[in-house]
Amino acid sequence: QVRKYCPKVGYCSSKCSKADVWSLSSDCKFYCCLPPGWK
């Protein structure tokens, strides 16, 4: 599931840290990294 935007709490990166939730969004070239347990 690709998000339209990466939430403000997240960040765009080619590689997220192990603790982060890996997500995809249209405004990110690679991955949208989100903090664990985010809502």
UniProtKB/Swiss-Prot annotation:
It is found in: Secreted. InterPro entries: Meleagrin/Cygnin. Signal peptide: none annotated. Its main location: secreted. The modification Pyrrolidone carboxylic acid is found at Q1. One of its GO terms (cellular component) is extracellular region. Denaturation temperature (Td) is 98.3 degrees Celsius. Keywords: Disulfide bond, Pyrrolidone carboxylic acid, Secreted. Disulfide bonds join C6-C33, C12-C28, C16-C32. The keyword DNA-binding does not apply. Belongs to the transferrin family. This is Small basic protein 2. It comes from Anas platyrhynchos.
